[in-house]
Amino acid sequence: MGWLGRLMLFPVLRWVVLGISFSSAVAADPIRKPVRSLLEIREDRVIVQKWETSCAAAALATVLTFSHNDPVTEKAVTMGMLRTTDPIKVKVRGGFSMLDMKHFVETRGLNGIGYKNLSFDDLLTLDAPIVPIDFQGNPHFVVVRGLKGDGEVHLADPAFGNHAISAEKFKSVWKDGMAFVVTE
């Protein structure tokens, strides 16, 4: 029996030899695939809000940047909306309104359309609607990405990033069938 045959009698050494041969073959032909963290996935194509009451600005920045190819920051939207509204009203309301968003997009040469009493099915026909929801008793704006095959509404949420909730849960927190849509 040669040295290789004797080596194969020892299980640990056999795996070391086989492991070296296998790893050499793998190293010769590496597989390259981009890896993203959970944070990157959660924040993909979402402008995350930096301030407690800036969800409207971040949601609008998300829609302008990713749906209308008009890159803008949350801060720029906030400052722009403050120029077209009464800051005291914003403070009393606890944030911006859909009318504030409308005035801002008009300064950028776009149109803003507000809806009320929409049905859920009608909402799903709109392109990147920003909707007000009730989040634990507080008003909050999110972007609806659509209803997926799993029966969940996928959201671009300025506070929590991309996530999904059941259609029933969404309907229970969606305020008055309201939506805001930016058009060309």
Question: Where do the PLM segments sit?
Answer:
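Early exported N-terminus immediately downstream of N-terminal targeting peptides
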Residues: 57-88
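N-terminal secretory signal peptides that target proteins for export/translocation
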Residues: 1-9
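Bacterial N-terminal signal peptides
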Residues: 10-24
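Conserved active-site-adjacent core of cysteine acyl-enzyme catalytic domains
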Residues: 29-40, 46, 79-183
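Active-site nucleophilic cysteine motif
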Residues: 50-65, 93-105
